[in-house]
Amino acid sequence: DYQAYAANLDKSAYSGNDLGASYSKKATTFKVWSPNAASVRVNIFEHGSDNEGDAGSIMSRAMSLDKTTGVWSVTINGDLLNKYYTYSVTHGKTTKETADVYAKACGVNGQRSMVVDLSTTNPDGWENDKHVLVQNQTDASVWEISVADFSSSESSGVSEANRGKYLAFTEEGTTVNGVQGASSTCVDYLKKLGVKYVQIMPFYDFGSVDESKNIMDQYNWGYDPVNYNCPEGSYSSNPKKGEVRIKECKQMIQALHNAGIGVIMDVVYNHLSLIHISEPTRHAQ
């Protein structure tokens, strides 16, 4: 019953920072906190969705429960870099397949998580990237923007391939309609105004946009999160590659910092895209 279920949650606690997939070339350890599950398996895939190549898993491993912490874990030997995975979680007689809520990378539409080495997603100069700070709070002029809205117009002066995407922020010298001497657009416009921070509307992975289709043919602000810790794929040049969306998101942040503009990430943990709490991989379309 609910009381027993909740009581078991209360007595299980884990303060570690290694939930998700911890990668090395020799092995990857998977950990997920699910104290009330009867069993958990991790399934490894070559691709991020059923629509790419062989849809079947290449391996599946049972995970072991630490009853003290409520953490299920398993270590798989070998190099799993950029392989995709899901968990099969059993509660009672029901088994659901789900992405990893702790994942930092995922495949198209967030249906499968991805094993990632974050150091390989760093753009050139990332080690020198720093937060933008102001001396006084009153100096913090903040503009709210959407990644898609920021450059989606044909008049933005941004190259067609980058319109509505992370990489639009990396283009310098953009003007209205690309006309030399015309008014500045995008990041150059923000610099001209003296904006110190941008609060970017959700750019975590959200469910209302089909990442396999052109972002210019769809629209949503993104307040329906699927994977809180993965960048949205529709804003990347290749949503099928989990590492690409991370690198290009970093490039956006780096470009803004280089322009003297700080970045505030709009995150809404009280919003969900789930149709039903027992269907973790299903989300509203």
What do the PLM-derived regions correspond to, one by one?
Residues 34-39:
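Short proline/glycine-enriched turn/loop motifs at strand-loop junctions of beta-rich domains
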Residues 275-285:
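Single conserved hydrophobic/aromatic residue that forms the stacking wall/gate
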Residues 1-29, 57-58, 66-173:
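The feature marks proteins involved in alpha-glucan
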Residues 32, 87, 145, 200, ...:
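Conserved, mostly hydrophobic/aromatic
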Residues 41-43:
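Beta-strand signatures of extracellular beta-sandwich domains
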Residues 141-143, 198, 263-265:
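Hydrophobic faces of well-ordered beta-strands that scaffold small-molecule active sites
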Residues 152-171, 193-244:
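Aromatic-lined carbohydrate-binding/catalytic grooves of carbohydrate-active enzymes
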